[in-house]
Amino acid sequence: MKNKIEILYDGIQLQLTDSLTKVFWDERPKAMAEEAAVQALRGECVSFQLAYSFEGWRFGEGRVQSFRFAKVKVESPVLPYLQVRKVMNVPSRYAAHKKNDDNYLRREPGLYPDLLETLEDDCVVSRKTSGTASGSIWSSGRCAPGTYPVCITFTDAQEADGQTLACVETEVTILAPKL
């Protein structure tokens, strides 16, 4: 298993993508291949992103679902080294100067993914939003080389038992430097 996405509720769409992809609210990002490796040398940072969309909003057709809020929970043996952030969309009225080149992703005013906020334990996200959870593992010297699972679970925040809505599993490999 490298990357596995399990959708248990009809109104959620999830997609793993690399950390450099800009995930716009109105455009489906390029998916990370199921067999793609998330890896780094020990002491380096390894990153990936999880794009999420509720109600099939913008990523496809969907319908209104009964849940209003979902809790996001991250589990991993390397959790002490894991930094999970939410990428917030911010408005931009001046995206590019009139005289610009081809190096811009977009030129028109709108919402742009820019602001990183720390995702706290059991963070609650609204079904009215779409966005990105960005995961970075700082593979410090204390993190032993090896392959570690990272599981990101979305559960219904309104139910006491927290019905699982979706789950994403990926593997992160920390490589030992070889001389």
Predicted regions span which residues?
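Short, surface-exposed loop/turn segments at beta-strand-coil junctions that are enriched for proline
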Residues: W57, W138-P145
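Contiguous beta-strand segments within globular domains
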Residues: A33-G60
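An acidic-aromatic substrate-binding cleft motif
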Residues: Q163-L179
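Surface-exposed binding patches on compact interaction domains or structured appendages
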Residues: K2-M32, G56-G135
